[in-house]
């Protein structure tokens, strides 16, 4: 790891020191008009040890993106990490960490009872063939089983 500070926040995180699963505040940006954008690192898999398979990850993304908005109007985006170990959860004007944990908890519980993956068709999705509701539900179940660990980022 370089001693030089990098522009991308996660590139400055020592991935060998973290212990998934966890939720950490990765950054705050303030807009020109005072809005605060909070980006959270929702890490599901241990970096460089495990990763989510794409169909499960893809379905979990669709499910969380849709279902989280039933619990808050502050959600801007839920986006998967390219390394397939987690998601970035981005909210506007919402700085209550415990409430973010509750939001993720409620959303994952919604995933467990979902009957289908939202927007899982060629009109609404760029890779509609790559989905697994069962895989997404298994990820949600495993993550919820470790709910008491989410606030512990480092080993």
Swiss-Prot record:
Reactions mediated catalytically: S-(5-deoxy-D-ribos-5-yl)-L-homocysteine = (S)-4,5-dihydroxypentane-2,3-dione + L-homocysteine
UniProt remark on cofactor binding: Binds 1 Fe cation per subunit.
Gene: luxS
Designated name of the protein: S-ribosylhomocysteine lyase
Keywords: Autoinducer synthesis, Iron, Lyase, Metal-binding, Quorum sensing
GO biological process, one term: quorum sensing
Function: Involved in the synthesis of autoinducer 2 (AI-2) which is secreted by bacteria and is used to communicate both the cell density and the metabolic potential of the environment. The regulation of gene expression in response to changes in cell density is called quorum sensing. Catalyzes the transformation of S-ribosylhomocysteine (RHC) to homocysteine (HC) and 4,5-dihydroxy-2,3-pentadione (DPD).
GO MF annotations in UniProt: iron ion binding; S-ribosylhomocysteine lyase activity
Species annotation: Chromohalobacter salexigens (strain ATCC BAA-138 / DSM 3043 / CIP 106854 / NCIMB 13768 / 1H11)
Entries under SUPFAM superfamilies matching the protein: LuxS/MPP-like metallohydrolase (SSF63411)
Positions of disulphide bridges: none
List of residues binding Fe cation: 58, 62, 125
Highest taxon in the source lineage: Bacteria
Subunit structure, as described in the record: Homodimer.
The protein's required cofactors: Fe cation
Pfam families the record matches: LuxS
Entry similarity comment: Belongs to the LuxS family.
EC number annotated for this UniProt entry: 4.4.1.21
